[in-house]
A protein has these predicted regions:
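Alpha-helical transmembrane segments and immediately membrane-proximal extracytoplasmic
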Residues: 1-186
C-alpha cells in the first residue's frame, strides 16, 4: 500500500520575508531548549545515585511520576504525535503551549534519567513543534495564521537538529515527516 507521511501538511504559499524575524527568534530559543533538555536529562540521571535509590527502584519512581502526570496532563505522555499534529494545525493558547513544553521537558528527563528506555529524538520534535507554536504567538508573526505550521515545523527541525547534532539529517527528516519540500527549506 501507499504510505503517507505522519504529519501530512498541505503546502502553503509563504514569503520567506514574512517569517525571517520569527526564524531568527526560533534559532537561539531552540538552542536554549535543546541545551536545557540535554542538561536536564543528564542531571536527572545523577539523582538516583545521589539519594541512594537502587537501580530497580528508579524506573518504578519514574513510572509513578508518569502515572500521576498522566492523570493530570496526559498530553505529555508517549510520542505525542496527535498532540503535535494539533499544535501544528490549531492555534492553541500560550499558557497551554508553555505547559506542554515544560511538562514534556521535565517528564522525559525524569523517565530517561531514572532508567526508562526511550530516545530523545521524538521528544525533541515535540518540544520544537511546541516552541514554534509559542513563537507564532508573538505579535511579529500572528498576522498570518498560515505561518503557524511553518514555524512549528521549523521549531521541530531546530530543536531536534540540536539534540541529535545533525542539522542536515533533521532537514531530511522534516521532508520525510511532512512530505513537503516547502517546509523542509523553511
Amino acid at each position: 500500500g501507499i504510505v503517507s507521511p505522519p504529519l501530512l501538511l498541505t503546502a502553503i504559499p509563504f514569503d520567506m520575508g514574512d517569517i525571517i524575524i520569527s526564524l531568527g527568534i526560533i534559532g537561539p530559543l531552540a538552542a536554549i531548549v535543546a541545551i536545557l533538555f540535554m542538561r536536564l536529562v543528564l542531571f536527572t540521571g545523577t539523582i538516583p545515585a545521589k539519594i541512594n535509590i537502587k537501580n530497580w527502584q528508579a524506573p518504578i519512581i519514574a513510572g509513578f511520576a508518569c502515572g500521576i502526570c498522566g492523570m493530570i496532563f496526559s498530553e505529555v505522555l508517549g510520542l505525542g504525535t496527535d498532540v503535535l499534529m494539533s499544535v501544528i494545525t490549531t492555534q492553541l493558547l500560550f499558557g497551554y503551549l508553555f505547559a506542554l513544553l515544560l511538562g514534556k521537558l521535565i517528564l522525559t528527563s525524569i523517565c530517561i534519567g531514572f532508567g526508562f528506555f526511550g530516545g530523545l529524538f521524538s521528544p525533541a520534535l515535540f518540544l520544537g513543534g511546541v516552541l514554534g507554536a509559542i513563537i507564532f504567538q508573538l505579535p511579529v508573526t500572528a498576522a498570518n495564521p498560515d505561518l503557524l505550521s511553518v514555524l512549528a515545523v521549523s521549531g521541530m527541525a531546530a530543536v531536534s537538529s540540536s539534540v541529535i547534532g545533525a542539522p542536515l539529517t533533521a532537514i531530511i527528516l522534516v521532508l520525510e515527516l511532512t512530505g513537503s519540500y516547502e517546509y523542509a527549506i523553511a
